[in-house]
Amino acid sequence: MQIVKSNCHNRYKHVFTELRKHLNTSVISDVNDSSQNYCGDMNFLKELGVYNMKHKHHTMISRIVGSIPPHVDDIYEYCSKVFLLVLSVGKGREYRDSMDLPMLYQGGKFISLREGDLVAFNQSKEHALFWDGRVDIAVFWKLR
């Protein structure tokens, strides 16, 4: 698990505009069941300079409120390496012990997430998202 790029929201505004246009803000998602699938023409990982491949990746755009408990996706038709792009981060509920930023967990390691961070992680290993507020994300899945 690592941050591949940061500040993507400033450097790749056209990507963010396209993804945010397709975010259904009235739906709270658990990523797998309620995500909006992007069906447009943009190959986001190519636009972000991560992969220079012709075929598109499956893109799921989600609004998440609260934490996602530790889980393993391990979806057979997708490669284990997936990319998560943070579209926006809402304020936490600001409890006295609230975190300042959402935290992605995998393999005993935590990474704090900011708007515009592009993170690569292994979907077939246990991972979790800890946050007491809202976070909008796009997840890019590559077919095997």
Regions found by a protein language model. Name each.
Residues W141-R144:
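Short beta-strand-to-coil "C-cap" segments at the C-terminal boundary of structured domains/repeats
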